Amino acid sequence: MGKLIKLITTLTVLVSLLQYCCEFNSGSISCERTQTLCHYTNPRVWNTYFSRNCELYKNKVSPGFDIVARKYDTAVKPVIDDATVKVNKVAIQPAFKVIHSQCKKWNCGKYYQLVRSPMVKTRRFFFAKYNAFVKPNIDKFFTAEFRSHLKERILKCKNIGHYYFTITSRCIKSKYDFIVGNTEEKLMGKFKNKDTHGIHGSVTHEPSSEDMVLTVSTMESDEEELTTTSTQTVVETITLDQEEASAVANHAHDDEASTDVEDSTDVNVNEQALLQEDFDMWSETILQKTQDVIQLFEKDVSKYIHGKLVEEANHFKAKFQSLDDKSKKFFSKISLAINDIECVEGIDSETGKKIFFDKSGSTEISQYITRELVREYFNETRSTLDELTNAMEKDLSEITDEIEKKVNAIREENVEVFEEWGDIIVNEWSKRMAYVDVINAHMGADDDTTLDEEKAKSSVNWKKFLKGKKQIIESRDKLAHHSADLSRVNAFRQKVQKKILSFTQESGEFLYILRSKANLQFQERERKERERKEREKAAAEEFQRQQELLLQQEEEDEEDVSYTSTSTITTTTTMTL
């Protein structure tokens, strides 16, 4: 069981690689065997075949296969194509140039046998494995019944081609036989009048089934030779006299007229039968064409969207990088301002003005940090980041609108292609049916019953024609309203919007943290300023109180001095008395 799984996996990989090579080199494959191998290993070919011949497969498996094929065309194939181009450009071409330049210097003749021997062994090994495991399964699949069915299909296509060729040749004949017939009759009359002893001329009859030439020539005055040649390469020679030759010529004209009537009847029958068969194929052709146009539309849309999103992804990557750099500059500016809130005041020795230093006192700052200044920094940061994010959202909306317009343009282009194809098909079928009606009117049978049957068939065919025309119109409407796969566009838009929202939230949270930190710094500075002012106020009050005490003490000292002086004067006066 494990070997069978490995074999199936190997065959799947080989078939996938083969199909990719066939599709990549579709315009440069000249070998018929390679083209046949590419055709019969294409899963889409077998899907179409089984859908037409197996109702269960058509209802159960084919829809899933179409979905997988569409996903492959839209999601996997563009990635593989880009990877192939990149690998070819980055690795294969440079390596080939290097190898080619080195091989010019080598004498590879002596290495030929060394390389050829392992390759021969490998080829024999693969052939042995193929004959042992793969070929029996292929022989079981390609049975006699399948081959006979395939042969019938090919013969049917061949008959249809032969039918169209016959119709074309008859159209040409119907236009020019009347002129040729009149010319032959005039020439025969002239020859009869001029030569009473012999007949010189030719009678040509071209029925649809075979080409026959009846030639009458006069060899002698008493003898004639009549030679009849057909496509069976049978030659009959008859010797007639003059009167018998004339009778044969007249009989040839009668045979031609009767044969034309029979051929017209055959044409009428074959036309009706083939027309009824082709109507069934017409419906399948319309469905297949509709499916092909839808696949082409989805492929073009996928290719355009892939290239557009890759381009815009690079642009938005640069925009997000610029947004991140600008936000870091604003945040750094605010952080420095917050750190400088706790600054140190000083006096310039030269000018005597106040100057400010950072909290370490080593670096001078440009200005004193206030609440109004920090609030201005926050508002500038918030407004700038909002402008940048709004511009990115606007660009994203414009890109989405541009993609939708381009998708609609691609859809309209494919619808126009289908309309042109439908107009040509309808015109060709209307001409063909009108041609069949003309044949029925002028070359129909004399029997009334047969005429009624032909009229009934013509009515049925015209109804089928109208049904096919309505089917084309419905298919056109289906193409016009077929929704494109914009899932990658929506995913890209959601991804960018999510990233913008994430950046907005992160920047808002960081600004909130910085604002809280700034408030704490300002509150701490204000607290210290209040304490300093209280200390200064207390020191001033203490100084004033000390001054008052000193003044009071001085006043008391002055009063003591005045009292001592008065006492001395009084004592002196008393003693004098």
Swiss-Prot record:
Locations listed in the record: Mitochondrion
Coiled-coil annotated spans: 379-416, 513-561
Keyword Methyltransferase: no
Biased composition (Basic and acidic residues): 525-545
Segment forming the signal sequence: 1-23
Keyword Kinase: no
Region listing for Disordered, in residue ranges: 525-577
Primary localization: mitochondrion
Bilayer-spanning residue ranges: none
Any one GO biological process: sporulation resulting in formation of a cellular spore
GO CC aspect terms: mitochondrion; ribonucleoprotein complex
Start-end of Low complexity biased regions: 562-577
Keywords: Coiled coil, Mitochondrion, Ribonucleoprotein, Signal, Sporulation
Quaternary structure note: Component of the mitochondria-localized RNase mitochondrial RNA-processing (RNase MRP) composed of one single RNA encoded by the NME1 gene and at least 31 proteins. Absent in the nucleus-localized RNase MRP (NuMRP).
Family: Belongs to the SHE10 family.
Name listed for the protein in its UniProt record: Outer spore wall assembly protein SHE10
Lineage, broadest ranks: Eukaryota, Fungi, Dikarya, Ascomycota, Saccharomycotina
